[in-house]
Regions:
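Domain-length accessory/inserted modules outside core catalytic folds
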Residues: 1-103, 107-185
Length: 185
């Protein structure tokens, strides 16, 4: 599901959440270790979203596909995961706002995933979480178009890697898949 497809679905159904925020929530819950199917996914979405039950029920097949797509991206051995954000055809200020919404959603989803306050993170993951929180407060001043585009691309790549790092650190071995080893003779 693309950003534009999800945006259209949410607008048609009347959701309060943006596409970026919803994808962030789902990814945060996944990063926190939740694996949800059927009614568990529905109930988790009801708990995390501000939208009405009927809206979630109507959109559940599409939201289930988004959940599976997100999990597949986070577990992909080729690191194919990408935060669902608007494309380059969208003005930079709107992309920055969407990135802030995605990061806030990710943090909210992580908090809703049931992690205890005593969850220990590596220094790298703790720093990544702090950076994600800072990105959630991102603004746009629009000084230099080319420099701003480069900065945005770097932030987007950092966010992608940070989400994978946090997911990988908190995921069970079953989520990551079997380790591959090479035997030298």
């Amino acid at each position: 599901m693309t950003f534009n497809e999800l945006t259209k679905l949410l607008e048609v159904e009347g959701f309060e959440e943006t596409a970026a925020e919803l994808h962030g929530i789902i990814c945060g819950r996944l990063a926190g270790g939740e694996r949800l199917h059927g009614d568990k996914l529905r109930n988790a979405l009801l708990a995390s979203l501000h939208s009405e039950e009927e809206l979630i029920d109507n959109a559940l097949p599409s939201l289930s596909r988004l959940y599976q797509q997100s999990l597949a991206g986070l577990t992909d051995p080729g690191f194919a995961f990408k935060p669902l954000l608007p494309g380059e055809e969208t003005p930079l200020a709107e992309r920055v706002e969407a990135m802030a919404q995605w990061t806030q959603g990710f943090l909210d989803g992580l908090a809703d995933s049931g992690l205890s306050g005593e969850t220990l993170f590596s220094d790298d993951a703790a720093n990544a979480l702090g950076d994600i929180a800072a990105i959630a407060q991102a603004g746009f001043d629009g000084d230099g178009e080319n420099e701003d585009e480069v900065d945005f691309a770097e932030l987007e790549e950092y966010l992608r890697v940070a989400a994978i790092l946090i997911f990988s650190e908190l995921a069970s071995p079953d989520d990551i898949g079997p380790a591959t080893s090479t035997t030298l003779h």
